[in-house]
A protein has these predicted regions:
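Short hydrophobic core segments
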Residues: 9-11, 34, 136, 149, ...
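Feature captures the FAD/FMN-dependent oxidoreductase FAD-binding
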Residues: 80-160
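Glycine-rich loop(s) and the adjacent beta-strand/alpha-helix scaffold that form part
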Residues: 160-206
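Glycine-rich active-site loop/strand segments that organize a redox cofactor
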Residues: 51-99
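An anion/pyrophosphate-binding glycine-rich loop and adjacent beta-alpha core
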Residues: 38-46, 54, 60-61, 189-194, ...
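Glycine-rich FAD pyrophosphate-binding loop
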Residues: 25-49
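A glycine-rich dinucleotide-binding beta-alpha-beta segment and adjacent secondary-structure elements
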Residues: 131-132, 138, 310-390
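N-terminal Rossmann-like FAD-binding beta1-loop-alpha1 element of flavoenzymes
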Residues: 6-33, 408-413
Length: 417
């Protein structure tokens, strides 16, 4: 542990800000942590459906691949503080973790509040000066160097400032985009803000009829301007406004981008991706022969979830009360085609306030990836979602926040003012 005696102001007590505060204090800096909300780590408390998906157990190179938003910018941050380093740190402070499907790492307690309380304890132990309900209005810059912050209570001088205010999603946790304004005021470019990892809204109303129905082992593909662009296999969920669930969230970043560019976006749902059209036709024929005395609505119970049957028949143009014995070959072909290719028109995303993460932010071209320091203002550092970085679900976003927070704090505490 070094003793820098530096004074560091950190704006925002989310994931990145909390680890930055702990890291800087460990390096001997005097840390002032400013948070506009009454509590620290509020977004941390709701991540992973309240369980806190801390990170992923995947090799660190997989993190780059799972970060469509400027993943390569994070090489140095991950090298300085990897998922292994994070877990070593947390385990050392007594947190017990577990690994679940897809390498997702959670607290063994399944309680995000345990992680939040751990950081609250560390702030106290490391004598971090915590300023709750004290939003920063702007960053003080003198002769091209960050020299402090201003709040409603006055000016606080500092040798370095770390901006960790988060994105624009989940505003009730304090993420309202304040950091974009502050960075923009001192000359930083803010790339267009849009939602990422967000449910999608459909033009068609039939998803509403299936509200609450979850599908597993299906394929959803997206096309923009008539060309297929992306595809995911896994689980999804119908809602009153459209579709959500893991594969929808993974594809939503691309859908959000294409919609913002004015491209028409269409989704295609394959209910039976493991079967070719020919094999599925044989399977349908077998089931129809088995249930030849029934109506069509009762003949597909072994092929489709009960609630899907009427929707699929309607889209295929087949009356639900049609006797199986009267089904024409062309109608059967339409049924098979519908199951392999259910079309949905994507008209938009849910509001950015509902996004799991925000795409866009402070341009990484103006930030040194080796230190997280601004290329425009000396002594100013950035970390977390305020930067133009975003990743898929699975613990990748929190690790990016932890890693950039750690690197920013090490750089700020270890350099001469």
């Amino acid at each position: 542990m070094s003793s820098t005696n530096k004074k560091i102001a950190i704006i925002g007590a989310g994931v990145a800000g909390l680890l930055a505060a702990v890291t800087a204090a460990d390096r001997g800096a005097k840390v002032m942590l400013f948070e506009k909300m009454p509590k620290v780590g509020l977004k941390m408390g709701i991540t992973g459906k309240g369980r806190c998906n801390l990170t992923n157990s995947a090799p660190i190179m997989d993190f780059i691949g799972n970060t469509p938003g400027n993943g390569k910018f994070l090489y140095s941050a991950y090298e300085a503080f990897s998922n292994i380093d994070l877990l070593e740190l947390l385990h050392g402070y007594g947190l017990v973790t577990k690994v679940e499907r897809g390498g997702r790492v959670f607290p063994a307690s399944d309680d995000a509040q345990e992680v939040r309380h751990l950081f609250m304890r560390l702030l106290k132990e490391k004598k971090v000066e915590l300023h709750l309900e004290e939003p920063v209005s702007h960053i003080v810059v003198i002769d091209g160097r960050a020299k402090g912050v201003v709040t409603k209570k006055g000016r606080y001088d500092a040798d370095a400032v770390i901006l960790t205010t988060g994105g624009a999603s989940y505003p009730r946790t304090g993420s309202t985009g304040d950091g974009y304004r502050m960075a923009g005021e001192i000359g930083h470019k803010i790339t267009t803000i849009r939602p990422a990892l967000i449910p999608l809204v459909t033009k068609e109303s039939w998803p509403k009829d299936l509200q609450g129905l979850s599908l597993k082992n299906v394929t959803l593909s997206l096309s923009a301007g008539g060309r297929r662009k992306a595809e995911e296999f896994g689980e999804m969920l119908f809602t009153h406004f459209g579709i959500t669930g893991p594969i929808v969230l993974s594809l939503s970043d691309k859908a959000s981008l294409w919609l913002s560019q004015g491209h028409p976006v269409e989704a295609t749902l394959d209910l039976k991706p493991a079967l070719t059209q020919e094999i599925l036709d044989k399977r349908v024929l077998r089931d129809l022969e088995k249930h030849h005395l029934k109506q069509m609505s009762g003949a597909l119970v072994e092929l489709l979830p009960h609630r899907m049957i009427d929707v699929v028949l309607s889209l295929a143009g087949i009356p639900r009360d049609l006797p199986v014995s009267e089904l024409k070959k062309a109608q059967r072909a339409s049924l098979v085609q519908t199951m392999k290719s259910m079309k949905l028109t994507i008209t938009g995303t849910r509001p950015i306030e509902e996004a799991i993460v925000t795409a866009g932010g402070i341009s990484v071209k103006e930030v040194n990836p080796s230190t997280m320091e601004s290329k425009k203002v000396a002594g100013l550092y950035f970390a977390g979602e305020v930067l133009d970085i975003h990743a898929f679900t699975g613990g990748y976003n929190l690790q990016a926040a932890f890693s950039t927070g750690h690197l920013a704090a090490e750089s700020a505490a270890g350099r001469d003012a």
